[in-house]
Amino acid sequence: MWTMFNNWKIFEDNLGFVPSEEIKDKLNEYYKILVEENLKYNLTRITNEEDVYEKHFLDSLLFTKETKIDNQKIIDIGTGPGFPGIVLKIFFPETDITLIDSNNKKINFLNIVIKKLNLKQIEAKHARAEELARIENEKYDIAISRAVAYLDVILELAVRFLKIQGKLILLKGPRADEEIKNSKNIDQKLKIKLTNKQSLADTGFGERINLFYEKEKSTPELYPREYAKIVKESGKK
Ligand SMILES: C[S@@+](CC[C@H](N)C(=O)[O-])C[C@H]1O[C@@H](n2cnc3c(N)ncnc32)[C@H](O)[C@@H]1O
């Protein structure tokens, strides 16, 4: 076996189950492709095996303790090298996943992963969220995003994709509370409500806060605005 990773206990401890052999094989293959293609596609600063499995793979899954994932239609906005979207697909093959990123290099890499891992019901699209959201209005049960933008920015980029009562899940770092305070009630304007906050203790790879929103009503026509406008108003990227 090319990879030496064997600390599967950390997955069991944090998720409550041991990944199957098929899941382990697919994660190992994903890690191999990530490391092999990293220089060419400029994917991640983290390449050490233990770190990738914990800081990228496991971190992409911790939110699933708070919400049941089965066959939902999910969009991962600003997926980069596939976090959390590819990892979710490996663990929950019944999902229907769309990965989007504005950087076409990432999309080329994701298509290699999808092909080599023989993943089904998953598509990688080169698109900007604020543009695609107008085309794919209210199409998704879940929109998810990790480390893409400041809270008020990502809320506006993501909300139109969701069906009414759809969930927006934001995988955030320790400053999520500060971002909520600074978001100037944009959630009310966007007709979306914070329903749950998952604070994860620092188990050696940084404190994480995952935010769960629910869409209450259709998105007002104004949103999302052009990216430059959103960022200008936010004052944050
Ligand atoms: C810091 S990376 C995070 C990647 C991945 N989600 C992760 O957790 O490692 C942010 C990604 O979001 C993408 N991105 C930024 N703004 C975007 C937008 N408006 N629409 C689509 N993708 C965007 C970037 O190209 C980049 O790949």
From Swiss-Prot:
SUPFAM superfamilies: S-adenosyl-L-methionine-dependent methyltransferases. GO terms for cellular component: cytosol. Pfam families: GidB. One of its GO terms (molecular function) is rRNA (guanine-N7-)-methyltransferase activity. Signal peptide: none annotated. InterPro entries: rRNA_ssu_MeTfrase_G, SAM-dependent_MTases_sf. S-adenosyl-L-methionine binds at G78, F83, A129, E130, R146. Keywords: Cytoplasm, Methyltransferase, rRNA processing, S-adenosyl-L-methionine, Transferase. It comes from the Bacteria. Its EC number is 2.1.1.-. It is found in: Cytoplasm. NCBIfam families: rsmG_gidB. Belongs to the methyltransferase superfamily. RNA methyltransferase RsmG family. Specifically methylates the N7 position of a guanine in 16S rRNA. HAMAP family: 16SrRNA_methyltr_G. This is Ribosomal RNA small subunit methyltransferase G.
